[in-house]
Amino acid sequence: MSEPIRVLVTGAAGQIAYSLLYSIGNGSVFGKDQPIILVLLDITPMMGVLDGVLMELQDCALPLLQDVIATDKEEVAFKDLDVAVLVGSMPRREGMERKDLLKANVKIFKSQGAALEKYAKKSVKVIVVGNPANTNCLTASKSAPSIPKENFSCLTRLDHNRAKSQIALKLGVTADDVKNVIIWGNHSSTQYPDVNHAKVKLQGKEVGVYEALKDDSWLKGEFITTVQQRGAAVIKARKLSSAMSAAKAISDHIRDIWFGTPEGEFVSMGVISDGNSYGVPDDLLYSFPVVIKNKTWKFVEGLPINDFSREKMDLTAKELTEEKETAFEFLSSA
């Protein structure tokens, strides 16, 4: 057996964490021979609920879970971490301006970034899920200057999986038969789901999605809006935000960081834009297609970008730039 790794999940009393923790504990994220010390952080008023989650994890009797620690203290939660999954954030309440939401979250992620800087290993991998995920991730990274920027990523895998599944449903294949969809930009309704480079397996052959579907107007219209607005559609139907699908996407995202991406396949994640070849401004946390090897991601280079894509990519970059500027005003005064 390997040495145990320390994995933190914040917002651990919430419903995404409730769907995620079992996957982490049972070996389907870090592998079946990787023991885990699982650290659960939430705010003080949630500690009663968190105790219940702790009891359930104990009752799962998972062989890989060496220890489970529930806490409301950052100095306990962030100590010696190998992986931090930052799920907890201030949710958007009715009538709340996006600016107010940003302000509340800058405070949280500045504090958690500082705790990573002070207590975690410098090799820690940080995955931000709490919304607005891209800007929260950038805030945390800026607050932890001695941890490499490349170690921070945010979740756009849920959007990626949504795009995959919409194509699969339309073609009557399984989601596994669709690969190399891309989510560009922000995890918001300006994100751009791009299937210009995606492939689908039909009758044993790989075919481009545009060629397979022969329905450009759907691909440039309804497909994009369906993926962009899927989160809102789930909330409308279920009266709660996506949890099972979000937890599955987090598991996919972390597993790919840990074990690498399959040959010939790329995935989407929000990463620092420095040095990209797609004309996205530096110093943004932007979702790109990446390949991963030895726990290190690289941009997929050289994909041709048409005018339709360019416009959509620029639009979401503009939104991220505005978010960043607002967040940084708060950051300097926080």
Curated annotation (Swiss-Prot):
The active site is at 187 (proton acceptor). The keyword Isomerase does not apply. SUPFAM superfamilies: LDH C-terminal domain-like, NAD(P)-binding Rossmann-fold domains. The modification Phosphoserine is found at residues 217, 241, 309, 332-333. InterPro entries: L-lactate/malate_DH, Lactate/malate_DH_C, Lactate/malate_DH_N, Lactate_DH/Glyco_Ohase_4_C, Malate_DH_AS, Malate_DH_NAD-dep_euk, Malate_DH_type2, NAD(P)-bd_dom_sf. Its main location: cytoplasm. It comes from the Eukaryota. Its EC number is 1.1.1.37, 1.1.1.96. GO terms for cellular component: cytoplasm; cytosol. Substrate binds at residues 92, 98, 131, 162. CDD domains: MDH_cytoplasmic_cytosolic. The modification N-acetylserine is found at residue 2. It is an enzyme of class 1 (oxidoreductase). This is Malate dehydrogenase, cytoplasmic.
